[in-house]
């Protein structure tokens, strides 16, 4: 029986339960990580980090033509359906200005990560071109290896090292560059202790032992920063003012709804002309991203016309 997942974007390829037989045919290594649930249904052992990685590898190969994908131990292994939702809702946002989704959009992924997940999905689904920024040498090396291992990706995805860990756009967006949008999955904890506590909650929910590796992993720069998510996004908002004529839409995920009011205040103080919130849901998980622009309707249309 094929049950639809509530809340996913209509164009999301993961509307229904995973077809494990098809995924195992695409990626045979997934077969060794299948288990039976108490109800007798076949499933993936989500408490096993290697199983989650094998599932991601299969999903990317089966749906997005990514034939070679791997990440080093300890890095975030992102749930593909949720990441795809961000891309599809971003496409809708970009399409609102002209009435159609742009086929040649240029996107900046702030903190592309070892998994390179957003560019992989965006290139396949919409033919977009991506620049990915990264502060971690190890993450950048992993993302670069994925790009080089898959035919055609090097023409669509380029990576830039963020040499200043205190900067977000500065040093990445060059003087004469223009982007249709930026996207970001920001660090959400405000300390290493909070990140560990969050990992422990996930571990308990998955029924893992204390010594087990957490299935979604995460390096320091992926999980926490001083002041947490609100401080990081406020910094992004402040810095975005310097690039107000080079970027059409700045966007970022916001993990908690209660974080929105201080961010809205920061956007008003920064002079954002329009602010949009896109709600998303994957099963029981609620998420959202906010988008802001410093251009009015006419300026946005002119920006797109000039850029094309």
UniProtKB/Swiss-Prot annotation:
Keywords recorded for this protein, A-Z: Cytoplasm, Methyltransferase, rRNA processing, S-adenosyl-L-methionine, Transferase
The record's principal subcellular location, in a coarse class, is cytoplasm
Example of a GO MF term: 23S rRNA (adenine(1618)-N(6))-methyltransferase activity
- The top EC class is transferase
Q: Which GO terms describe its cellular component?
A: cytoplasm
Give the superkingdom in one word: Bacteria
The residues forming the signal peptide are none
Q: From the UniProt record, give one GO term of the biological process aspect.
A: rRNA base methylation
The reply on keyword S-adenosyl-L-methionine is yes
User: Which reaction(s) does its UniProt entry say it catalyses?
Assistant: adenosine(1618) in 23S rRNA + S-adenosyl-L-methionine = N(6)-methyladenosine(1618) in 23S rRNA + S-adenosyl-L-homocysteine + H(+)
Gene3D superfamilies given for it?
Answer: Vaccinia Virus protein VP39
Instruction: Identify the EC number(s).
Output: 2.1.1.181
Please give the InterPro entries that the UniProt record associates with this protein. Answer: METTL16/RlmF, rRNA_lsu_MeTfrase_F, SAM-dependent_MTases_sf
Q: Where in the cell is it found?
A: Cytoplasm
Name the family: Belongs to the methyltransferase superfamily. METTL16/RlmF family.
As for what it does, the entry says: Specifically methylates the adenine in position 1618 of 23S rRNA.
Q: Which PANTHER family match?
A: RNA N6-ADENOSINE-METHYLTRANSFERASE METTL16 (PTHR13393:SF0), SAM-DEPENDENT METHYLTRANSFERASE (PTHR13393)
Q: Which HAMAP family match?
A: 23SrRNA_methyltr_F
Q: List the protein's name.
A: Ribosomal RNA large subunit methyltransferase F
What organism does this protein naturally occur in? Salmonella agona (strain SL483)
């Amino acid at each position: 029986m094929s049950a639809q997942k509530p809340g996913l974007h209509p164009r999301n390829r993961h509307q229904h339960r995973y077809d494990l037989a098809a995924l195992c045919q695409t990626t045979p290594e997934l077969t060794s990580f299948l288990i039976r649930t108490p109800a007798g249904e076949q499933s993936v052992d989500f408490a096993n980090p290697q199983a989650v990685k094998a599932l991601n590898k299969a999903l990317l190969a089966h749906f997005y033509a990514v034939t070679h994908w791997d990440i080093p131990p300890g890095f975030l292994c992102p749930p593909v359906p949720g990441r795809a939702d961000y891309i599809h809702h971003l496409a809708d946002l970009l399409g609102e200005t002209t009435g159609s989704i742009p086929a040649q959009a240029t996107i900046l992924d702030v903190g592309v990560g070892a998994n390179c997940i957003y560019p992989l999905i965006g290139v396949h689904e919409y033919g977009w071109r991506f620049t990915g920024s990264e502060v971690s040498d190890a993450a950048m090396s992993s993302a670069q290896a994925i790009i080089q291992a898959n035919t055609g990706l090097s023409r669509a995805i380029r990576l830039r090292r963020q040499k200043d860990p205190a900067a977000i756009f500065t040093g990445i967006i060059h003087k004469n560059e223009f982007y249709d949008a930026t996207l970001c999955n920001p660090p959400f904890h405000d300390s290493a202790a909070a990140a560990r506590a969050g990992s422990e909650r996930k571990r308990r929910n998955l029924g893992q032992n204390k010594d087990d590796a957490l299935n979604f992993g995460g390096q320091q720069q992926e999980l926490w920063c001083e002041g947490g998510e609100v401080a990081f996004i406020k910094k992004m908002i402040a810095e975005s003012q310097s690039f107000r004529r080079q970027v059409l839409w700045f966007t970022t995920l916001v993990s908690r709804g209660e974080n929105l009011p201080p961010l809205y205040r920061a956007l008003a103080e920064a002079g954002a002309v329009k602010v949009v919130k896109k709600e998303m849901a994957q099963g029981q998980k609620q998420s959202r991203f906010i988008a802001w622009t410093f251009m009015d309707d006419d300026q946005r249309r002119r920006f797109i016309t000039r850029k094309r």
